[in-house]
Amino acid sequence: MLDLIKSHNNWISIIKPWYQLARLDKPIGFLLLMWPCLWSYTLGSTIFSYNISLKYIIYFILGSILMRGAGCTWNDLLDKKYDAKVKRTQSRPLASNKISSVNAIIFLIFQLFLSLLILIQFNNVTIIIGLLSIIPIIIYPLMKRITWWPQVFLGITFNW
C-alpha cells in the first residue's frame, strides 16, 4: 500500500508542473475562450439552420483548453526571468526551474500541433480566423514591456 501511495505522489509531482504551465489549475482562462466560441456556434447554428453537433462542441472545448495553455506557455517562456523576481509569479514552473525552457518549447509545439489538428476540422473561414488569432497571442507578452496597460491587449487577444 505504501508503494502505491509513493508512486501516486511521484506521478502527481511529475504532472503538476505541466498542469500549472498550461494553467489548468486556473480554468477561468479557457472558460473566457470557450464560452464565446460555444455561444457563437449556437447562434450561428440557429441563424443558418445548422444542427448543433456534439463533435464541434468538443472541438471548441478542447481547442480552448489547448490554446489557453499554449498562450500561457508562450507568456511564461518570454517572462521567465521577470517571473522569477516577482513574488506572485516566482513559483511558476519555468521561473522556478521545475521545467526547462527547452521542454516548455516542446510542450508549446505539442499544444499548438494538437490545436491545429482541431482547427483543420472546421471550414476555411474558421481556419483563417483561427490562424490569425496567433498574432495577438504572440504579441501580448511583449506588450508588458512597452505599455502600462498590457491587459487591454490581453482583452483584445481574448476577444479575437
Positions of predicted regions on the chain:
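Membrane interfacial helix-start motif at the N-side
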Residues: K16-G29, K98
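Intramembrane alpha-helical segments
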Residues: Y19-Q20, R92-W160
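Juxtamembrane/transmembrane-helix boundary motifs in multi-pass membrane proteins
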Residues: H8, I12, L24, I47-K55, ...
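Membrane-embedded alpha-helical segments that form the functional core of polytopic membrane enzymes
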Residues: C37-L38, T42-L78, R88, L112-L116, ...
